[in-house]
Amino acid sequence: MKNAYLLLTPGPLSTSESVREAMLKDWCTWDDDYNLEIVEVIRRKLVTLATTQSGYTSVLMQGSGTASVEATIGSVMLPTDKLLVIDNGAYGARIAQIAQYLNIACRVIAPGETAQPNLDEIADVLTHDPAITHVAIVHCETTTGMLNPIAEVAKIAKQHGKRVILDAMSSFGGIPMDIGALGIDFMISSANKCIQGVPGFGFVIAKRSELEQCQGRARSLTLDLFDQWQCMEKNHGKWRFTSPTHTVRAFYQALLELESEGGIAARYQRYQTNQTQLVKGMRELGFAPLLPEKLHSPIITSFYSPEHSDYQFAEFYQRLKQQGFVIYPGKVSHADCFRIGNIGEVYPQDIERLLSAMQHAIYWQQA
């Protein structure tokens, strides 16, 4: 079945027809052909994609990507631990909010939504606040499309003996990285992002030695990362509670398609080509990106809304949707913007078609 429109969003995103077709069969969650041949293969493939180093393992967790973030924060931190959160967007802020809900001591460095964190400030905070045990940062902050300097932040954290939690929700699978080389202790992502699966579960790739220490720490039964991992380890991929079977099977297919494309490096190149073409074309149409080019990720781009008095995002959105494209509203608190993603089953020819559709959607210039 073909889609009526292309999702130019940071996830859920447009998937291939073969990924969607993978969900047309039912699976028994007790059978080896599901647990051993799908779930366990997924777990191994994820670790291989994340790092060339040994000592890492993976665990899948039902729910949204945020559920996996909360499972990690809530299962990793001791009552005496303290979290430093780098917050330059809605998703960094969400990590701090999770810590607040769970009564976890938290300190926040917030440089603003359009600025990268100051590395000297991070080092200074870690030097003068020895209570901090963990540092959390978002890799691609889709509030704006900014790519944060995770290598530099992780290096500083490790120099101060801290554990690092990386929210790679919108980057893993689409941007090359080796979390072992970076010193990441826990990395979190989701099925419906750069791997190009469908929503339904997230996953955590962690140092085995760190995850082994998390027994009994969880503040939630459902979101107990350690118990979920132990269940999968001891029962060959079995989930503690109902497994999202159709989503899992679609994700397995998406992983195969990532390999067929040439792996993460090839997918990154496609995303980068999409984003470069998008920004060039949008500039030619009179739209200005929110961020300077050096801060852009290849995942999603924020553009300032036109200042014309007749412009309304809802009308603009509908005119694009009628032509087969769905974009995202803005999320920046201090600027009127909209966002366009270029991940998922999106290719340069799709960006070309979008730019053509844009010319017909700019109704405020046609009056």
Curated annotation (Swiss-Prot):
Keywords: Aminotransferase, Pyridoxal phosphate, Pyruvate, Transferase
Residue numbers of N6-(pyridoxal phosphate)lysine PTMs: K193
Biological processes annotated in GO: organic phosphonate catabolic process
EC number: 2.6.1.37
Catalytic activity entry: (2-aminoethyl)phosphonate + pyruvate = phosphonoacetaldehyde + L-alanine
InterPro entries assigned: Aminotrans_V_dom, NH2EtPonate_pyrv_transaminase, PyrdxlP-dep_Trfase, PyrdxlP-dep_Trfase_major, PyrdxlP-dep_Trfase_small, SP_NH2Trfase/AEP_transaminase
Cofactor needs: pyridoxal 5'-phosphate
Superkingdom, taxonomy of origin: Bacteria
Presence of keyword Transferase: yes
Xref: SUPFAM superfamilies: PLP-dependent transferases
One of the record's GO molecular function terms: 2-aminoethylphosphonate-pyruvate transaminase activity
Database matches in HAMAP family: PhnW_aminotrans_5
Self-association and partners: Homodimer.
Function field: Involved in phosphonate degradation.
Family to which this protein belongs: Belongs to the class-V pyridoxal-phosphate-dependent aminotransferase family. PhnW subfamily.
Protein name (database record): 2-aminoethylphosphonate--pyruvate transaminase
Species of provenance: Vibrio cholerae serotype O1 (strain ATCC 39315 / El Tor Inaba N16961)
